[in-house]
Each structure stands twice: as structure tokens, then as C-alpha cells.
Amino acid sequence: MSNLSYHEQIDRENILKLRGLVRDLPPFCSDFFRGIEPRTSSRTRIAYAYDLHVFFDFLHRENPMLSKLEIRNISLEHLDQLSVTDFEEYMEYLKYRCNDKKQEVMNKERGI
């Protein structure tokens, strides 16, 4: 491991972090991350994983159809059933929410 450059060490740490994040998402998300791997940095993929976690957490907490499912059990078929209203509610949710650490998160229009 000591033969790795600084950037290689950071990339390795990011890859391990991403694996942990993807493990908590629905299985089909793994295909997405494998697909974007050649054209994105590990830090970009981590940011996408956080964004997907926020989205699926919203569905799990706020959507009556999906609230009884664990996040890992949400399927593409479930996503196909979402309406425009569901996405509008998600966009509104992004303006103010509490994260997993019970910290308040506020986004302005530019951050959504």
C-alpha cells in the first residue's frame, strides 16, 4: 500500500467509501455506478451516491406506496409508478430537511 501515490491512496479510500454507500442503495444502482465509472472521478460518484441516498430516503419516509419497503427493496418498477407530483414533492423536500445526523439542511433554488 505504501507504494501508492497520494492521489492513488485517496482514490482507493474513495472507492471503499463508495462501495459502502452503494451497499445501502437498491441493487440496480450498482449498474449505474459501474456504467459511469470510466467517465467520472471517485469523488463525483460519491456525491451521486449521497444524492441517491437522499432521494431514496425521501421515498422511504414520505411516499405512502414505498414507506413500508426498505430502501434496498425499492425496484425500478416502483420508480416507474412515481408521478410528477412525487418529484415535485421531492424538489420541495430538498429545500429543507434533516439529514441522517439530525442536522438541518437548507438549499436555495440554485442548490437544488
Residues of each region from the PLM?
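N-terminal core-binding DNA-recognition domain of tyrosine recombinases/integrases
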Residues: 29-43, 53-112
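A detector for short, charged/polar N-terminal pre-domain segments
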Residues: 19-23
